[in-house]
Amino acid sequence: MARLYDFYKDSVVPELMKQFGYKSIMQVPRIEKITVNMGVGEAVADKKVMEFAVGDLEKIAGQKPVVTTARKSIAGFKIRDDYPVGCKVTLRRERMYEFLDRLVTIALPRVRDFRGVSAKSFDGRGNYNMGVKEQIIFPEIEYDKIDALRGMNITITTSAKTDEEARALLAAFKFPFKG
């Protein structure tokens, strides 16, 4: 079992039950999935770029990403329908907790001038979005072997009904919020 999942069962659940007055442990919010998305607009000009992006995301997530394609043609961006424009990976269960553990304990502290993540990035339904400017903050990526710095979006989907519950859940996982 993942270290963070055991921590969730043993520490987070009782803490949140007491804080919000839940009657059952099934009412306690939990993290359902983490989606890591990497937009690769440069792939339109050079197909090799997509292979590098997929490789990087696979190393970071430990799972093979799905290549996302353009839904419709846009002449201004020189993209056609079904052109590869990015890749994403959806993590659940064990891999999700391992990724969250690495993100909070290793990757985020390696960001330059890091002061914490914004607490305003909740969507109103208990989900959290954050952006990472460069993939080299993850220890799995070797600095010498990358072709370009690429950012990514990380979406944490929770079963929380409100942003307040979701924030309490992530804070219990030692998520580094500002202030």
Swiss-Prot record:
Protein name per the record: Large ribosomal subunit protein uL5
Keyword Ribonucleoprotein included in the entry's annotation: yes
Hydrolase recorded as keyword: no
Superkingdom classification of source: Bacteria
MF-aspect GO terms: rRNA binding; structural constituent of ribosome; tRNA binding
Sorted UniProt keywords: Ribonucleoprotein, Ribosomal protein, RNA-binding, rRNA-binding, tRNA-binding
Cellular compartments per GO CC: ribonucleoprotein complex; ribosome
Biological-process GO terms, alphabetical: translation
Gene behind this protein: rplE
InterPro entries: Ribosomal_uL5, Ribosomal_uL5_bac-type, Ribosomal_uL5_C, Ribosomal_uL5_CS, Ribosomal_uL5_dom_sf, Ribosomal_uL5_N
Subunit: Part of the 50S ribosomal subunit; part of the 5S rRNA/L5/L18/L25 subcomplex. Contacts the 5S rRNA and the P site tRNA. Forms a bridge to the 30S subunit in the 70S ribosome.
Its job: This is one of the proteins that bind and probably mediate the attachment of the 5S RNA into the large ribosomal subunit, where it forms part of the central protuberance. In the 70S ribosome it contacts protein S13 of the 30S subunit (bridge B1b), connecting the 2 subunits; this bridge is implicated in subunit movement. Contacts the P site tRNA; the 5S rRNA and some of its associated proteins might help stabilize positioning of ribosome-bound tRNAs.
Protein family according to the UniProt entry: Belongs to the universal ribosomal protein uL5 family.
